[in-house]
Regions:
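Short, compositionally biased P/S/T/A/G/V-rich stretches that sit at domain boundaries
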Residues: 1-8
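Catalytic nucleophile-elbow at a beta strand-turn-alpha helix junction centered on a G-D-S/GDSL motif
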Residues: 91-139, 143-147, 170, 175-179
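Surface-exposed cleft-lining segments at the edges of enzyme active sites
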Residues: 40, 143-145, 179-182, 196-234, ...
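Short beta-strand segments within Ig-like beta-sandwich modules, predominantly Fibronectin type-III
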Residues: 34-40
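Histidine-centered active-site loop/cap adjacent to the catalytic His
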Residues: 315-347
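Conserved aromatic beta-strand anchor motif in extracellular beta-sandwich/beta-rich domains
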Residues: 24-28
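Surface-exposed, short loops/turns at beta-strand junctions within beta-sandwich domains
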Residues: 46-53
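Substrate-gating cap/lid alpha-helix
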Residues: 259-303
């Protein structure tokens, strides 16, 4: 049996004076996990029991009556390599989501999966809004994929595509909820980069963001254009359940990370403005996934992103949801486990 790894976190703290004290906290995936109470030591060693992103913080009191000075270490990652299990049978899958789900199937280990339908750059609100019936003039875009996604978002053809291209499973991630919405031709569409470059967008179009409301009972709600976001999610789930059973639905819960690895291999934090956006969008995503689980209680959930970081040399560039390759292997392992579990239940 291997003992857990130990990590020493350099915090660059000068030794406190005789009357001073230092407390050390260990955080895993942003949550406090271990505490070393006030001591005169200037460094600390922790045992790391699980995979994840760790960092330590030192709370330094040079005088007992003073507020502590807080110093954070650089993060380190503990990770065991993931080895996907071969799935028992050829499996078809559709995606309502983003590149963070689609990129799984670029791995060599996914030969037994076939993608039937990929819907991207569409928010839940847009998907269940009224289709634009007027003829759409020529859509501009750098790629055919961009043009197809904008056309789908305008015509609201998501559910008909999913229905026509039958798949064994539907994989859902909500990364594209990061885009605001725009009022266009009497409907709501996703203000993705593709829409902004399509030739359809003009700056005078009203832009809508999800409004966070704190309720008297302490709960949280989001509204879009005066309507509860939860109602949009309920409508979305009703449409999805007319096509897939709950056991065919896999929720790929992704949170935006505050850490990335630069081209020199160093772990860094994103700039404060990026971290502020991450905090806001992660709050929205937590709410949305909670709603999805409310309406799809028997669906599967893959929730692994908290222990991983982004990489600057990602093929799509640096972004808080463009993860290290180990993340995609871990998600693929979880996906294969779900598929194999379903196969065993049927046989």
């Amino acid at each position: 049996i291997c003992s857990p790894p130990r990590a020493r976190f350099p915090l660059f703290t000068p030794p406190p004076p005789p009357s001073g004290r230092v407390a050390f906290y260990l955080f895993r995936n942003g949550e406090r996990e271990q505490i070393k109470w006030y001591t005169q030591a200037s460094e600390v060693e922790f045992e790391l029991f699980q995979d994840g992103l760790y960092h330590a913080a030192a709370f330094i009191k040079y005088k007992e009556e003073q507020q502590p000075i807080i110093i954070h270490s650089r993060p380190i990652q503990v990770l065991h390599p993931a080895v996907p299990e071969r799935i028992r049978n050829k499996t078809t899958i559709s995606i309502f989501g983003s590149c963070v789900s689609r990129d799984l199937f670029e791995l060599k280990q996914t030969d037994d999966f076939e993608i039937k339908c990929y819907i991207a750059r569409q928010s839940i609100v847009s998907a269940v809004s009224s289709p634009i019936t007027e003829p759409v003039r020529s859509i501009l875009g750098s790629t055919a994929f961009d043009r197809r996604q904008v056309f789908n978002d305008i015509k609201k053809s998501t559910f008909s595509q999913l229905r026509d291209k039958t798949a064994d499973y539907l994989l859902i991630d909500l990364v594209d909820e990061r885009f605001p919405l725009v009022k266009y031709e009497g409907s709501l569409v996703t203000m993705s980069g593709g829409f902004q470059n399509s030739g359809l967008y003009v700056p005078s179009l009203p832009i809508l963001k999800k409004q966070r409301l704190e309720l008297e009972n302490g709960g949280i709600e989001y509204n879009v254009d005066g309507k509860s976001l939860r109602d949009y999610v309920q409508s979305f789930c009703k449409e999805i359940l007319s096509i897939f059973s709950q056991k065919q639905i896999i929720l790929h819960r992704v949170r935006f990370t505050n850490y990335y690895q630069n081209r020199e291999g160093q772990l860094c934090e994103f700039e404060p403005n990026v971290k502020s956006f991450n905090f806001s969008i992660n709050q929205q995503l937590d709410y949305l996934y909670k709603c999805l689980q409310e309406f799809l209680p028997q669906s599967h959930m893959i929730d692994l992103s908290a222990g991983y970081y982004a990489v600057e040399n990602h093929k799509w560039g640096l972004a808080a949801i463009h993860f290290q390759k180990e993340y995609y292997f871990a998600v693929l392992c979880a996906l294969c486990d779900i598929v194999n579990l379903g196969y065993k239940a049927e046989h």
